[in-house]
Amino acid sequence: MLNIFVICTGNSCRRVIGEALLNHLGNGRIKAYSAGSHPIGRINTGALATLNRHNLPPEGYQSQSWKDFEDIPMDIVITVCDNAADETCPVYLSKAIRTHWGVSDPGHVEGSEEEKITAFEETFDLLQLRVQKMLALPLETMLPEELTEKLNTIGKLSLTEGEN
């Protein structure tokens, strides 16, 4: 089983959705964890509501620091925000394959409740597309360089490109 670590700076929205999707769609093939480099101390209620709308359990998520996972050997690290992508990861993550899957922060969307829900749904859909593409790969047997290249390509997919 591969351990996958989803990192975001604030650790309240995107990483929760990413972790939930990886664990749900991974069907025991992978174990996903998530944390933040500078966690804000709470999970965004919009992220939890999005999981609930998709029948994924919203319970058990905490705003955690990446320091809380030092004892778990990570195989793949996925950053989902640009700030986290530019940060230096802790030494314990140095052997992991790193990739960046930039996603706009739905927690920063201003507007009506419908517009906010739409932003979270778009985030969910984009992360779901990328996770599905990743899980279609023979992750366990790929060479690190090949896997890194594929994951980087997946990280550039948009929702419109995923329809092709």
Regions flagged by a language model, labelled:
Residues M1-D68:
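Conserved active-site segments centered on acidic
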Residues G10-S12, D82-A85:
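Short glycine-rich anion-binding loops that position phosphate/pyrophosphate groups of nucleotides
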Residues V16-G18, N44, E87-P90, E110:
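Short glycine-/acidic-enriched loop or helix-start segments at secondary-structure transitions
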Residues Y33, I76-I78, T99-W101:
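Hydrophobic/aromatic beta-strand patches that form the interior of the parallel beta-sheet core
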Residues G36, C81, G102-S104:
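Residues at the C-termini of beta-strands that transition into short coil/loop
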Residues P58, A84-T88:
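Glycine-rich nucleotide phosphate-binding loop and flanking beta-alpha elements
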Residues D71-P73:
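Alpha-helix C-terminal capping/helix-to-coil transition sites in glycosyltransferase folds
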Residues T88-N164:
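Phosphate-binding/catalytic loops
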